[in-house]
Amino acid sequence: GMRIPSAIQLHKASKTLTLRYGEDSYDLPAEFLRVHSPSAEVQGHGNPVLQYGKLNVGLVGVEPAGQYALKLSFDDGHDSGLFTWDYLYELATRKDQLWADYLAELASAGKSRDPDESVVKLML
C-alpha cells in the first residue's frame, strides 16, 4: 500500500519538510525536494532536466493533491510538482544516496548549487 506519513511539518525558517512514518522521522531540505520535483518542466518530457542554483530556495506551501500526493510550492515560483506518497517515501528513505548522485551530476555538468556562482572547468 501507499506509504502515507503520519505527520508532515513544514519549517519555513530552516527550509525543511519533516515527514514522520511511525517512529521514523525524515528531514528533507527544500533544495533537495526542488531538484527532485517530478513536474513536467523538471522531467522535461522523459529526459530529466538538471536543476541547479537552488541552494537558497525555500518552501512556501504544502497541500494535499487528492488522496495520492502532496503539492509543494517553492519560493522560486515552482509549484507544479506533485509528489506522490510513494515518491516522497523514496526521497525520504534514500535521501543520502540521491543527494550524492545529484552532487555528482552537478559536478559533471559543471553546475553549482549557488545561483551566484558559475563553475569554471579547467581543461588541463
Predicted regions and their residues:
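Motif-centric detector for short Cys/His coordination patterns
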Residues: 1-124
